[in-house]
Amino acid sequence: MTRRLRPILAALAAALLALPAVAQVTLLNVSYDPTRELYAEYNAAFAKYWQAQTGQKVTIEQSHGGSGKQARSVVDGLEADVVTLALSWDIDAIANAALLPHDWQARLPDNSTPYTSTIVFLVRTGNPKNIRDWDDLARPGVAVITPNPKTSGGARWNYLAAWGYAASKYGSEEKARALVAGIFKNVPILDTGARGSTITFVERGIGDVLIAWENEALLAQAELGKGRFEIVVPSASILAEPPVALVDKVVDRRKTRAVAQAYLEYLYSPEGQEIAARHYYRPRLAAVAARHAERFPKITLFTIAEQFGGWEKAQKIHFGDGGEFDRMMGAR
């Protein structure tokens, strides 16, 4: 047993002791757009595990959409037992509404991010527009598909990946601003979430390149349009860390804390990590990551803390009202 798993298993044991005598329980997981397939498999695995451990049947219901929009729904009263969103700022917004504590990231390993991803490009077979790196997305005549950063967490990662690449390469915020503005000038449609953008590109045939979560690009290539797409890995991208959290006010009111806590902790178990890897997320557990290493290309990654000083600062400067993104869109 690894040192990393001991506290998780101990917490699971404590959760079992705290379990109320209810034969069946339902949880709501409010998640972001492209996790549908991941949680469909994970929910079934956890339900089987939980019943074997406790005798209690658990049903997990899902809600999916753009991460920012989902966070607002929880703040507005959607009774999520757990949230599994695209970025920590969206869960911070739920904490600001006093639905969970501000130190929520300290409650699970790796700042409550059981898996990671990054941002890559999906192009049509043969790469007809010869897309190789971020600069190519701002070329005239290249139609770029990405969702709206105002509603989509994935879109915010996309935007920051492009900005961080340019700021690092050129050593200039002005050149980073120009590149990102050029990319968004080439965007014909801003869907509200990442899955909507995937559908626009894959099923509707719009655009030359999709800026996408790595897991979404791999899913599209392998399962949604086999033989129709290629993945282009840029020279540098951002380490995307989608976090998870318990919504304390809801679980305490619904008496679901024990099973909801176990649900999140099981994401860190070997089975939970294997499921994440099968659905193209980069697992945290080293042994699982090693088994799936060929699936995930090596790429130079920077973090939001390194390039932007964290989500609070990035959100205010780039995505707040009147911020960089609003000014870009106003100038289009």
Where do the language-model regions lie?
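Stable alpha-helical elements in mature extracytoplasmic
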Residues: 34-38, 42, 70, 87-90, ...
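Short helix-loop capping/hinge motifs at secondary-structure junctions, enriched
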Residues: 126-132, 151, 164-172, 250-258
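Short beta-strand->loop
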Residues: 30-32, 123-125, 143-169, 183-187, ...
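N-terminal segment of the mature folded domain
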Residues: 24-152, 330
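N-terminal secretory signal peptides that target proteins for export/translocation
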Residues: 1-5
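Bacterial N-terminal signal peptides
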Residues: 9-20
